[in-house]
Amino acid sequence: MRLVSRRRLKGLALVAFALIGITIFVRILMEFQLEREVSFYKKFFRLKKDGLHGVYNPIDIKQIPKQTIDDLYRAKMETVSASKPIDWSKYAYVNYVTEPNYLCNTLIMFHALIKKFGTKAKLELLISNELFKSEIQSRNEQVQRILKKIRELDSEQIVIKEVQNIVKPTDQSPWNESLTKLLVFGLTEYERIIYLDNDAILQDKMDELFFLPNDITFAAPLTYWFMSEKDLEKTYKEVQHDKMSINLNKYTKQLSNRIRNGKEIYNHLPALPQSLYLNSDRVAKEILDSTSSASPLFDADSLKKVGKVKFASNLMVIKPSQETYDYIINDCLPRIVNKKEKYDMDLINEELYNLRHVVSRQVTLFRKLRSAFKPSILVLPFGTYGILTGSIRKPQEHMIMRNDILGYKNIDDEGNEIQKSIEEVVLNNKYIHFSDFPLGKPWAYSSFDQLKCRVDPASSKDVAADQKNCDVWNSIYESYFTQRMVCSKDDSPKASEIQAA
């Protein structure tokens, strides 16, 4: 009996090894075939893109330059007439508030959007119903007073909706209610929304983002602050290796012509270098690893990994969808709500818009039926829609901020790289997010002087440059404290009023 058992065990072992061998062989064959397809797609779309219609490159994530966004908006406005006006009720800027000390920021933003910048889109505030249940009467009065000011901006244009918080029950961090922002994906009464975290300063309206190409359901800037100058240099080499120009001016000129002539632009947009979101240069391997049917033999632990950059979640352009909303509420949230250090940006980049998975889905659709794949995501330029205040004081991030279409340079007609000062970068940015760890948010301070940037000559390597950066940084915070006057009872500056309640 023992001899038979040993024979059986040997037989089972041989079968197991044979199955593993077959699995590995099939995988190698699949990867080889897919790698050939990827190479073909790259060459095909590089050479044939001008004549294509309704067929889109599935192996790239596309970036859209600011000039192209403006060109699309200009083209849209040229079609507007008295007989065919834009229905602005289909578009909205959206904030959410779960804490009293953030409510004033929504008032500041909405006041600027209506009174200063003149947007006609709806402005919607999702406010936690917990804010109306405080046992402190003065806090309740404070909330109601600020809400009254918000409504008085324009009772028709402003929409205030009470919501229930989505809370991580065992999390005591400042972000334990950040998942609440995901409710914005369910605002299906709008055709497109611009979601904005309100711990930021607005320098202009962003109406142009409502009119991105119609198939785009999600667009956002990238987390550029995770990159180094070395990473940036690598992206230039990668683009050139793919026989593409790194001169952004060449792309924007061609895109402008196509928009003027009513032609599709997706295949002509600059691609996001794949080294920024793939874990290796074997594109086929990454695609196969990202499929739901990937074998655990092949690095299954990497399925949820994201690359060097991912989507920021402080500014998002969204086409609300009941299907996406249901997926978030019923599938994604239960998986993440009890996980440590997993918040809104993690859910968006691991569950919804993991760039590796996006490319895998695109290729899968394209291989089944070319016309089945329609691009649905875009990368927005962070140099216009999302820098951090902390980056202003970090000279090593300035080069990245100047070239916000990653892998490409702003080069003039003479072939010279266009140099932008940090003042120009900040001036041209529409949305600047307060992020200066270990400093707190500006409303945590009673006056600007408490957080004013000052240069220490003893420790500075370049006093003049550091002072310039400080001056730019200070100008943003000074502007915030000035704008915060709108929240005070008697319209006098009381920057810490919300905290005092």
Swiss-Prot record:
GO CC annotations on file: Golgi medial cisterna; Golgi membrane; vacuolar membrane
Family from the record: Belongs to the GNT1 family.
Compartment annotation: Golgi apparatus membrane; Vacuole membrane
Chain positions carrying an annotated carbohydrate: 176
EC numbers, comma separated: 2.4.1.-
Role, per record: N-acetylglucosaminyltransferase involved in the Golgi-specific modification of N-linked glycans.
Lineage summary: Eukaryota, Fungi, Dikarya, Ascomycota, Saccharomycotina
Keyword Glycoprotein applies: yes
Chief subcellular location: Golgi
Chain ranges on the Lumenal side, renumbered to this chain: 33-501
One Pfam family per UniProt: Glyco_transf_8
Keyword field: Glycoprotein, Golgi apparatus, Membrane, Signal-anchor, Transferase, Transmembrane, Transmembrane helix, Vacuole
GO molecular function: acetylglucosaminyltransferase activity
Keyword Membrane appears in the UniProt entry: yes
Top-level taxonomic group: Eukaryota
Alphabetized InterPro entries for the sequence: Glyco_trans_8 (IPR002495), GNT1/Glycosyltrans_8 (IPR050587), Nucleotide-diphossugar_trans (IPR029044)
Cytoplasmic side: 1-11
Membrane spanning stretches: 12-32
Short sequence motif DXD: positions: 197-199
Record's bilayer topology term: Single-pass type II membrane protein
SUPFAM superfamilies: Nucleotide-diphospho-sugar transferases
Biological process, per Gene Ontology: protein N-linked glycosylation
Species: Candida glabrata (strain ATCC 2001 / BCRC 20586 / JCM 3761 / NBRC 0622 / NRRL Y-65 / CBS 138)
Protein's UniProt name: Glucose N-acetyltransferase 1
